[in-house]
Amino acid sequence: MKYTIYTDGACSGNPGPGGWGAVIIDEKNKQINISGKENLTTNNRMELTAPIRALGKIKKDSKIIIFTDSTYLKNGITLWIKNWEKNGWKSANKKPVKNKDLWLELNKITKQRDITWKWVKAHAGNIHNEQADKLATEAINN
């Protein structure tokens, strides 16, 4: 099965109450929207939580494309994480990587799946990205 996923995270204050949202679309164009919230978090933690939760809904043998408007998420999972692992989870400036717990969880999940990561510009009219944004924002208040 093939899936396309759009994810987003939001925070009211940083840190503060946060929400995440994901739009999951299968190859038959069936769409599932999921979202959640945390009372005290950061926008980056919500950006990481969204794909973790979305991937938990999909069988491991699926082919997946994930769209995110977060360069932190896309670059972290496709570029930076290899160096973090090599450097004992230290960033380029030798400080501990923030959100290590979520990066470890996301890395474990993504290694078990065929995933292509793509960046999409935020608030640029992409309907599914806008839906993910709305889900994340609305989750904060629900």
Feature roles, as predicted:
Residues 1-45, 49, 53-60, 134-142:
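RNase H-like nuclease fold core
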Residues 10-17, 53-131, 135, 140:
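RNase H catalytic domain
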